[in-house]
Amino acid sequence: MRELWVRWGRGYLRLMLLGAVYGVVEEGLIIKSWFDPHWKDLGMLGTYGRVWGVNTVWAAWLTIFHSLLSVSLPVLVVEALYPSYKNKPLLEGRGLAVAAGSFTLSGLVMFIFLNPYRPPLVQYTLTIVLVGFLLAVARYLRKPSPKTSKGQTQHPFLYGLAVAFLLFFVYTAFPHSSLPPVVTILLGVLMALYFYSQLGLLDDSSRFLLVLGFLSFWMIPYDILLELKGVTGEAAVGITAFLLLLLRWRSVVQKSPLEGAPVNRES
């Protein structure tokens, strides 16, 4: 997805769409958790918001989750920590072919063996159409113009942390309330859109802190929760990864101080 993003003209809306494509492909087409009412991770979301054979709230949540955590934020972290690779494709023809082939092969294996559930044909076909539509929109999206307004320049780390917590809270707590599923879906989507909108309004340093704040929720409190639930070593891995990101970022800033540097904003 990162290679397509660079080749198609960057922009954070485009990155969001490509991340969403990945989420739809993984959860909808490969794992089929969009449709399986008994998928192991669903919990309440196997019934809350299940419409026409689709776990709609789960589908929205996992699309947002993968768009951010599986695609967009890793891409932005790499660009921040290794600025010399920014705007440069990392794979050429053979590398792209190997990556695409590996993803397709692993996807087929998981489709067949990970979850034997057979999704409804019409809904599954429409999900394939959705993937094509999102790819087309991402491909032909107009190149964004530079932004002049400012984003969350004060305490971007805390802002990112707050958005991550609120997204998690909305999609884990609200299904236990009397709120209609459509409200839960829309709240999460609006928060994700607002988060993406901030990325293009910040300088490089503030953008990284915003991203790190979002990631910190999953690396520290969430991983500690997983540790308490029996996932041995998860807390140590999360905290260590967070500290390593901080150390690497400090090294980058020391080599190329960003204080007073020109603001690099995109949308």
Question: What label would you give each PLM region?
Answer:
Residues 1, 62-79, 126-143, 185-195, ...:
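Hydrophobic cores of alpha-helical transmembrane segments in multi-pass inner/ER membrane proteins
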Residues 4, 28, 76-81, 198, ...:
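Hydrophobic membrane-targeting alpha-helices
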Residues 4-11, 84-92, 141-154, 198-205:
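Membrane-interface helix-boundary motifs at transmembrane edges
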Residues 10-16, 20-25, 29-99:
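Membrane-interface helix-loop-helix junctions at boundaries between adjacent transmembrane segments
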Residues 30, 39-62, 134-167, 171, ...:
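Membrane-anchoring/interfacial helices and their immediately flanking loops
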Residues 62, 116-126, 173-184:
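Interfacial loop-to-helix transition and helix-capping segments at the boundaries
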Residues 86-138:
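Loop-centered beta-sheet repeat module
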Residues 145-267:
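Extended, charged low-complexity segments
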